[in-house]
Amino acid sequence: MKFSRQLVLGSLAVLVLSACSSSPTQRRQAKDDFDYLETTEFKPWVLPQGATPQFYPNYDIPQGAFHGGVGNVVDIRPPQQVLELIPGARAERQNGEVTLWMLRQDEAQKVWDTALKMIAERKIPLRKQTDSMVETDWVDWVSEDEDVTIGSRYLMSMVETNNRYGFKISLIGWRENGQVQTVSTTNKERYNAFMTNLVTTRYDSDVRAEAARRAQELVKQIPITMGSDRSGFPVIIARTPYDVLWQRLPELLPKMGFTIEERNQSQGTVKAKYAAPDDEFWQQVGVKPIELKSGTYTFLFGDLGNRTSINVTDSAGKPVNEALLKEMVPVLSAVVDKK
């Protein structure tokens, strides 16, 4: 199940969940029938006089007063997991509530700020708000897994205990088709996890956006020189980490006349077809055209820590000569600077 989109009607937030096909009842209930509910009670065995019974406790049914649904009331859907998208955070689930624990207060504060941002962007109405607590109004969930429209209210708060700092989400109100009801343990756990995941996915999105922004800033200032790899062979050296350079390759190589056909980050290879740019390109970058024939080439990128090595092979897998690599250095530098 995934979050697909959000609708806002007046002051009521409506969150839409999508699921796989089939009816809601089929997704929630076990297949076949529920004839076992009509099973008559067991009667104790009557042993022949003088017989000595042998008891094996392996399959004893535990005795006790157990509470919970039976038959078509039992929800067979797997528990909704809390997405672990916040580095260093540990999710604790207790009594249907979710607490994300962090080791530092600033980390918990960042999660709190993310939650407030998510609430504002999704226009979730609030009933109460303090510096460390918010109580939401009704949030409606339209889910393909449900026969009814689910409504829920939440209490989100910052907590602290034993030098740990947490962000806690508690489901405090439940209704179905507008009628307030007592929430089941299963639904409390499930819809607490849904709301928690709205926060964790937003946190992850913000972190990725910030990483991309930093990478873009770093790539603007990449010194490009000739050098040698660990084996002493001539290569182009980009003075930036491998991961940073890799993110920018889809933009940099096409500007040099290379159409990317295949990429494999784990192997550090990019297969691309080269067609010489027009005269206008060379005039803009202020570099003379390189003597590279049109065709398919493979770029080989090596992780050297805070630097990245770049080599190029032709369609036969043979490295291009050192002179050609030297010609490519000012071109690559000009494209990076232009970016």
UniProtKB/Swiss-Prot annotation:
Disulfide bonds: none annotated. Residues 1-19 form the signal peptide. It is found in: Cell outer membrane. It is a lipid-anchor. Keywords: Cell outer membrane, Lipoprotein, Membrane, Palmitate, Signal. Gene3D superfamilies: 3.30.530.50, Outer membrane protein assembly factor BamC. Part of the outer membrane protein assembly complex, which is involved in assembly and insertion of beta-barrel proteins into the outer membrane. Belongs to the BamC family. This is Outer membrane protein assembly factor BamC. The gene is bamC.
